[in-house]
Regions:
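N-terminal Sec-pathway targeting helices
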Residues: 1-14
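Membrane-interface motif at the C-terminal end of an N-terminal transmembrane signal
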Residues: 15-33
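Alpha/beta-hydrolase-fold enzymes
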Residues: 23-24, 164-255
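N-terminal cap/lid segment of alpha/beta-hydrolase-fold proteins
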Residues: 30-78
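Short beta-strand element of the alpha/beta-hydrolase
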Residues: 79-88
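Structural recognition of the beta-strand scaffold that forms the well-ordered cores
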Residues: 84-85, 113-116, 151, 177-180
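Catalytic nucleophile-loop/oxyanion-hole region of alpha/beta-hydrolase
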Residues: 94-102, 109, 114-151, 161, ...
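Conserved alpha/beta-hydrolase "nucleophile elbow" surrounding the catalytic nucleophile
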Residues: 153-159, 181
Length: 255
């Protein structure tokens, strides 16, 4: 789920990442962070100055490790430092306007950015295939990245996938850093909170209201995907997919 505040926070996190991990020069890191901020926020005067001072990045839509992806890269020859961006659950997926502006901003700052269409996220479902695709794209990106490593960046659900992917043995030694904004770090607690409006604190169960309606819908759709294959799973998944993302009581369909 994208929120207006999360993307600026993401840039702050990635600014720190670039400063400590990808560039030896602190000043260069701050200049690149400014490129990303201006490219994403597009303030009128500064955006024009950025376009004059930097070359237009190249954006293309192509499969990476079998996953449809937007790839943004700087003009000119590489290799470049590389980022894999894991989006949150949004119907616009990899073509979300804010995400595309962010990718262009990173490309103007000298990064190659991969924005994969992770399976399930466009319809609010997080499944094992979502993680497998994150890992697969990161491996493919690292194969051609400068230094053979990539930075993993994610927002919301994508942040959780980025954190989990970085732990996978297939990416051992191939991740330069991870930056996650508003990730879900305890999936069991998230599902409990989303579906019941309660959470555990030690041995106690405490109420937490209001639980975000869309979070409950994502949790329910994701849990339905994990049920054994069969007509019951199909009926539940179909019913949940028919619920509007803005429904304040999305689980009423299960009553």
């Amino acid at each position: 789920v994208l929120r207006a505040l999360r993307i600026p926070l993401l840039v702050v996190f990635v600014s720190a990442l670039t400063g400590v991990g990808l560039f030896p020069s602190w000043v260069a890191a701050q200049a690149r962070a400014a490129c990303v901020l201006v490219g994403m926020l597009e303030p009128p005067l500064l955006a024009g100055a950025l376009r004059l001072a930097t070359r237009e990045p190249v954006l293309e839509d192509r499969p990476i490790a079998g996953v449809p992806s937007v790839v943004a890269r700087p003009a000119g020859d590489g290799p470049w430092p590389t980022i894999v961006f894991a989006n949150g659950a949004t119907p616009e997926g990899r073509h979300h306007p804010v995400v595309l502006r962010l990718a262009r901003g990173f490309a103007r700052a000298g990064f190659v950015v991969y924005v994969p269409e992770l399976p399930g996220l466009r319809v609010g479902e997080v499944a094992p295939e979502s993680l497998e695709a994150t890992i697969g794209v990161a491996r493919a990106a690292a194969d051609v990245a400068r230094g053979g490593r990539v930075g993993l960046v994610g927002v919301s659900t994508g942040g959780s996938l980025a954190l989990r992917a970085a732990q996978d043995p297939a990416l051992h030694g191939r991740v330069s850093g991870v930056s996650a904004v508003a990730p879900y770090t305890d999936i069991r607690n998230v599902f409990q909170l989303a579906t019941t409006g309660t959470y555990r604190e030690g041995e106690d169960v405490r109420a937490y209201e209001p639980a975000e309606g869309y979070l409950a819908l994502v949790a329910a759709r994701s849990l339905a995907r994990l049920l054994p294959e069969g007509p019951d799973r199909e009926r539940m998944s179909t019913a949940l997919r028919a619920v509007s993302d803005t429904d304040p009581d999305p689980l009423a369909v299960l009553d």
